[in-house]
Amino acid sequence: MSTTARKVISQGLQYMMLNEYLQRQLVRANYVHAQFFKTPIGTKVIVYAGVPGLVIGRKGANIKAIAEVLEREFGIENPQIDVVEVPNQDLNAKIMAYRVARALVRGVRFRRAALVALNRIMAAGARGAEIVISGKLTSQRHRTEKFTRGYVPKSGEPGEELVDEAIVHVLLKLGMYGVKVRIMKPAKMPDTILIKGVTQVG
């Protein structure tokens, strides 16, 4: 294996560990993902979250603490953290999965939690959405329930390019539950053909 390949793999593993750390620390802030860019003076870190204020913390205390951990534990040189609020949050699979999971924690029945989320997603303009909840839903046996609205492609270019997907796990009294959300974005399908009106001449 070449030195370049090793470097790429090492960097990929580091970013995966960084993402897992930020996910744990910023779950209440509806953390979605982060980007890392090398700069002449250090590393620029862009954190995308649903509630930026919880990332920053009171007087910036939380974001300063995170920066210290990134530098000390992960070797990120002089991290400069910016926080970006995720737009159109009802169309973001990760944030909607968080919302369903929190509803389950509050004791909302899983069907109601899923249907409320589906209504919000479709009202926001999605072409389709799918929510899968797994765990001990109504008994001591583990099972899975799926709720779908509209059209959500499973494969091909639409499934890869136009579907946002996320999974969130939450620990309840009966055990671990999984919430998977897939959202078909309100975009034109690749095979959509627009037929314009024909003007007759003569």
Curated annotation (Swiss-Prot):
Q: Which residues form the KH type-2 domain?
A: 18-87
Record carries keyword Transcription regulation: no
One MF term in the entry's GO annotations:
rRNA binding
GO terms, biological process = translation
Coiled coil spans: none
**GO terms for cellular component:** cytosolic small ribosomal subunit
Q: Where is the signal peptide?
A: none
The cysteines joined by S-S bonds are none
Keyword field: Ribonucleoprotein, Ribosomal protein, RNA-binding, rRNA-binding
Q: Which InterPro entries match?
A: KH_dom (IPR004087), KH_dom-like_a/b (IPR015946), KH_dom_type_2 (IPR004044), KH_sf_prok-type (IPR009019), Ribosomal_S3_C_sf (IPR036419), Ribosomal_uS3_arc (IPR027488), Ribosomal_uS3_C (IPR001351), Ribosomal_uS3_euk/arc (IPR005703)
Q: Does the keyword Ribonucleoprotein apply?
A: yes
Family of this protein:
Belongs to the universal ribosomal protein uS3 family.
Function, as annotated, reads: Binds the lower part of the 30S subunit head.
| Subunit and partners | Part of the 30S ribosomal subunit.
Q: What is this protein called in UniProt? A: Small ribosomal subunit protein uS3
**Which species expresses this protein natively?**
Thermofilum pendens (strain DSM 2475 / Hrk 5)
Q: What does UniProt list as this organism's lineage?
A: Archaea, Thermoproteota, Thermoprotei, Thermofilales, Thermofilaceae
Q: Which gene encodes it?
A: rps3
